[in-house]
Amino acid sequence: GNEYLDYDYVVLASHADQSLRILDQPTSDEKRILGEFKYVANTAILHTDENLMPKNKLAWSSWNSISKEDLSKTCVTYWLNNLQNLKCEENYFLTLNPIQKIETDKIITSVNFTHPYFNLRTAKLQNELFSLQGKKRTWFCGSYFGYGFHEDGLKSSIEMIKDFKK
């Protein structure tokens, strides 16, 4: 709602662009740094369709890339049984941004989300993210502190907690 809540501290564990939108009165540094991080839409499909894997099963790996001839579109299929050490007979895959059809009856679920898009500017600004910590009692963490992976979000939260405790 529109009610005003008062807190001692705020931790924004979200994407940089979301954090910036949440802030009622962002500082000039928060605008400058967080505002540079852009995000791209992605689709992830959990499925059992082996057609998105190499034809030769000996070539299967945890991460499998498929691209078109012009290389403008590339997708990745993760072989979850291998990647997550799943002990089951059926093979499970997670495909990001598929460029070929996945058999409908083999789709388990689909989810849309965004990932940070990094460039030279944001790579340089990552070092400045730490200068925002604790200003106006606001703390930040998220995958944009690293390479955009979930593990980077976790790592940034651990680092944030260490700074918070000082």
Spans of features found by a protein language model:
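Mid-domain catalytic core of redox enzymes
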Residues: 1-116
